[in-house]
Amino acid sequence: MQTINSKSLLRCAVAGLTIVAASAVSFGQNYRNSDDAFLPSPVRSASTVPSNGDVNPYGVAFIKNNFLTGSGLLKHGDILVSNFNNAQNLQGTGTTIVRIPQSGSPSLFFHGNAPLGLSTGLGTLQYGFVLVANLPTADGTSGTAQAGSLLVINNQGQLIQTITSPQIDGPWDMTVVDEGNRASVFFSNALNGTVSRINFSVSPAGLRELSHYTIASGYLHQGDPAALFDAPTGLVFDQNTNRLYVASTLDNAVFIVRDAKSRTTSDGPGDVVYQDNAHLHGALAMAEAPNGHLLVTNNDVINSDPNQPSEIVEFTKWGQFVKEIPVDPNQGGSFGLAVHKVSDDTSILAAVDDNTASITIWTLPLN
């Protein structure tokens, strides 16, 4: 157990949390990287509230090095955050995506026209497109939720396509498999408790749907005044095994759907890989760490525990708990997160805090 893969990504994050105060300007100006340094890199926090006042940050995505930035607003290493609520804090009414640069102040990347509710489903394609799932409501309640759509935004921050499909029914989260001229997008649907896959061809002109399938179904789902929906949410696709990991909030468990990229029929909910009432409190958004572990946030509505607020839980793909850390001292803060491997030695973990409408960014050594 001496390899990098056996170590906890969150171990370094916990250490980083203890020196948040040290990331003030005076420290940052004097900080120098060193291979034998003990102290982790400073923890950074940024507001996700744009000028129109949108709140409740949900989706998180990195602009990777293969993204075609062109002359657009985005730069490699930027972080994007989608907002689900408007300035009146009505769920399913947020219309903005905020850009968090590697240095400098956040700025507005995209402002769409209502009705929109930009959910946790946020991703990118190397052609220079940003994809965001849209689950709008009329008044912030689940009773007025609509089927929604997938928005395709170019690197200039301009909406170029709005895609609807029978396989998009309240898109609560998604994950994107980017293969250049082709892409597969997996959606978790809050309105019917299913997971679907839409295959696209991709060109500079945009996306064209090739086929669509429901590949998993039967997840518990319900409307919830606090969270809008308790439903299947976080998705992680494992290219090596062709398996899709699904975090289902109301089931409070993580499932495996086998043959996810090739199957054309539903596998039911798949098989439970991780169910842990001691650490899971409404399994929500999910990301994969560079060590192969999975990271899942919790909505704190299901199996609530005030002594474990706003946790990110790290566990192995065979269902063994590793570690947990909070993103907020109060319940209800954790939601979207993403991990970006910068180099063989360094990764970045970014996680939103819905309570404070902010994002926390950790730079973590992998060795």
Predicted regions and their residues:
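Bacterial N-terminal signal peptides
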Residues: 13-23
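Beta-rich, blade/repeat-based domains predominating
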Residues: 49-76, 91-94, 112-130, 135-137, ...
